[in-house]
């Protein structure tokens, strides 16, 4: 059984809505201040500010093309703001050397691709790049960091396997191990459960919750609203490049707010396992119109 095995949801050790309402936190290490972010001169987000509470499990939710991943790319330094700034540990993140950022912040991007034929151990070892120096190459500390990351994700038995031989769930855990090998306190995850079956989704979410309880700040973009409500203690809800709400799951995941964000009629009930909010869709009428597209079918 992987070493990250966590208490059953709803047990005393598991986070509850009450726990989430009053987390012990310091000043935010990571925040966006009045940022404008976009691509090729076309802004997706304009004048947005957001704080990531230190020690939190923050989840960013919202419909497709609302700016969730764009915000995460800005927070990770992959996308430079056209205006405003992203601040990491009191400094503008774009002014910091890439290796310095990588020693403080780890990122799991969407649809990461491994080099052909690379083994699990070699891929996870790439997480140590930020710790290499001209006069300090691979060391026993690097070896320990890789082994600990493999062990934490339950992928140590796969170390000698080629990544392209693994299942989708195994491959995603290997990518998480690579990020853990960076040994950062901040982890940014862009849709980490996409394309996984429900069992692998829950397994990964339990791993992230375990890492959060172990002291890491987690920031994840998720499509599954009920995963967000169950595992996060801080939710940022977006629509059309704006933040509509932020706060605890009980504050953000309400029936009226969910309909405002997604246009989805719904009922929010008590999760029978955690006691937190659980969204039950009422359904929406079928339409031949493609959401988010213009009359020609081209995405808006």
Predicted feature residues:
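Helix-to-loop junction immediately C-terminal to a conserved catalytic motif
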Residues: 76
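Conserved ABC transporter NBD signature motif
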Residues: 84-92, 101
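Conserved ABC ATPase signature
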Residues: 137, 162-166
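Catalytic Walker B motif of ABC-type/P-loop ATPase nucleotide-binding domains
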Residues: 187-191
